[in-house]
Amino acid sequence: MANRIKKGDQVVINTGKDKGKQGEVVRVDGDRVIVSNANLIKRHTKPNPQAGVAGGVVEREASIHISNVNIVNPATGKGERVGFKVLEDGRKLRVFRSSGEALDA
């Protein structure tokens, strides 16, 4: 099945410590997404001179389950659910469920 959320989509987070935050999808891994500047975690890394990596505390984005984000509708500015509409030529088109407005051109 095709994913309702793709890389580059503007999304809003529904649950968790970052509830209400908006950001762009950086990566989609199956049923998990990474959203820019959301769900930040700290990783303690060892220095590795061979790879040129300095040690220390690194802050980066962690993944969020795909069910915990909604795509932002540019017309309303709110997060809304997305469904699919099958065109006559067999292609699938992502549409907002509330308005039926097409998400992809």
Swiss-Prot record:
Identification of the protein by name: Large ribosomal subunit protein uL24
Molecular function GO terms recorded: rRNA binding; structural constituent of ribosome
InterPro entries: KOW, Rib_uL2_dom2, Ribosomal_uL24, Ribosomal_uL24_KOW, Translation_prot_SH3-like_sf
Matching SUPFAM superfamilies: Translation proteins SH3-like domain
Matches recorded under Gene3D superfamilies: 2.30.30.30
Organism, as annotated: Xanthomonas oryzae pv. oryzae (strain KACC10331 / KXO85)
Source taxon at top rank: Bacteria
Keywords: Ribonucleoprotein, Ribosomal protein, RNA-binding, rRNA-binding
Pfam families: KOW, ribosomal_L24
Positions of disulphide bridges: none
Family: Belongs to the universal ribosomal protein uL24 family.
Subunit details: Part of the 50S ribosomal subunit.
A Gene Ontology BP annotation from the UniProt entry: translation
Job description of the protein: One of two assembly initiator proteins, it binds directly to the 5'-end of the 23S rRNA, where it nucleates assembly of the 50S subunit. One of the proteins that surrounds the polypeptide exit tunnel on the outside of the subunit.
GO cellular component: ribonucleoprotein complex; ribosome
SMART domains, A to Z: KOW (SM00739)
Endpoints of the signal sequence: none
